[in-house]
Amino acid sequence: MTVMEERFELASQRILEIEKRMPEQFQRYFAENADYLGVLLEEYKWVASGAMREASLQELERHNESCFIDLMGRNYETSYANPDWAYAQLGETFGQLLCAVAAELRSLPAFIYEQDLEGITIRLELFVEIYCAFAESFEETKEAPEYSRIRDIFYWFASDYAELTAEHAIRHTVDWGQRFALDIIENADLSDIRYLFRFGEYIADDQWKLAEHLNGLPEEKIQKIADTYTEGFRKGFELAKKPLDKKKSVQIRYPLGFERVVKAAIENFRKMGLEPVIARTPASFAEGRRVFRLGFFGGAVNRQFDYDHENDKALYLDKKYVHRMLECRKNAWEEYKDMAVVHAGPAVIEAFGEEPFEPASKEHLLTLSAEQQKLYVEYQSQAGAMTNEYIDPEERSFTCIAFPVSISRRFSTKC
């Protein structure tokens, strides 16, 4: 057993043994989140067993729903991942902080389905460490722990794993050796829409109906769509007089349901000498999850949830953290610099026509202070400059093809 496997087993066992050792106000929070984590631990075993491949469509739907249940519809109103509910239940001192922890735990389905043991373990350990801090404090002093103690646990979670966060971000941009999504796209029976559930994303009606619609199209039509998409990318280099023959990879970003088109596009790109880079949009707020999504992604289980937690970084964003993140990104770019220099840029499939999203302005959202806003702008600026240092903007391109969300409309393209 590896060290990481031992850590995973210890954290898992501790979660399953959570006891009633504190006032009901906090006990409910830890019990409900422990129950959710217990469901995900069973999901981890189920995915690892391979049983998913033989499961019925109805069973797959049940599993998918269980991963996202408390973010769905009206369930979110009484979820500890909802800032206003968490504040009402946990109080002014801990409401926002423990809500941010709950939100971070909701990123776990992505790590579960990719069988990313480290990504799972560090989030289980975050929860266990915070639980133990509360349990020990109530046992020893009959009082809740100091806010600073719990905030420091969350801060050091973000800071200690900044190296992992940065490595993920850069690898997901340029490393064509990633196989998770590619294996599904290239090897699954795409005529059987059960394949959609293997991605570990929320599967809504749009993904389901889109995949069914594309399955009903002849191969010639699929190829024509893929050709329009990939030719747009090639012509971008041609028109800008940029050397495509120097490049070895292209990042494919798309919403789930388009797998038949993406599979055909992959073959087109390979004929150009480009290997596909296909990675998930960030699932974790610590890794950059937001309303606007990059990479491959499923349905938006709850855009209000994404909006509510975009500024959870207010709990750890300071000069020290920014310096560490930039240092970690620099190290990650150095690690992947040979892949970065031959990266051609993103080829994007978009969907338009979604119902407009108007977020509710909740009273207890975390917000960045003026100083933090300044720091974040500085971080974004330096991170962007670093990207341009390793992927020369004069030698990369971009294309986008867009389709209406509703499959009842005629498909249209823009490149």
Where in this protein do the model-derived segments appear?
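Active-site bordering "gate/hinge" segments
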Residues: T2-C415
